[in-house]
Amino acid sequence: MIWTAVIKGSALVTFVQGAMVLVDKIFGEEILPHRIYSSAEASQLLGMDRLEVLGLIRSGTIKAKKVGDNYRILGSNLVDYMNR
């Protein structure tokens, strides 16, 4: 009987933790100005497709540096884009 309560309690705790992580992912994404983001991360933060982000980079709308085959974007550049 006690083990049933322990299992149910741990399942509830796991569910609540998962819900908190999900809420944080949806509503708590904060762009850190000094952090460096990949184009994939930037697309998630901006709520657009990665190809759209690449287009904005290539047009000069978002400043980024190419490292190897990938672009790296400073968080402050994402904030600047969002404040336009």
From Swiss-Prot:
One of its GO terms (cellular component) is magnetosome. Transmembrane segments: none annotated. Disruption phenotype: When both copies of this protein are deleted cells have a weak magnetic response and make magnetosome membranes; the magnetosomes are less numerous and smaller. Deletion of just amb0973 leads to an intermediate magnetic response and still makes magnetosome membranes. Deletion of genes mamH to mamV (amb0961 to amb0978) gives cells with no magnetosomes and no magnetic response. Induction: Locus amb0973 is part of the probable 18 gene mamAB operon. Keywords: Biomineralization, Magnetosome. Signal peptide: none annotated. It is found in: Magnetosome. This bacteria makes up to 20 cubo-octahedral magnetosomes of about 45 nm in diameter which contain membrane-bound crystals of magnetite (Fe(3)O(4)). May play a role in controlling magnetite number and size but not in control of magnetite morphology. This is Magnetosome protein MamR.
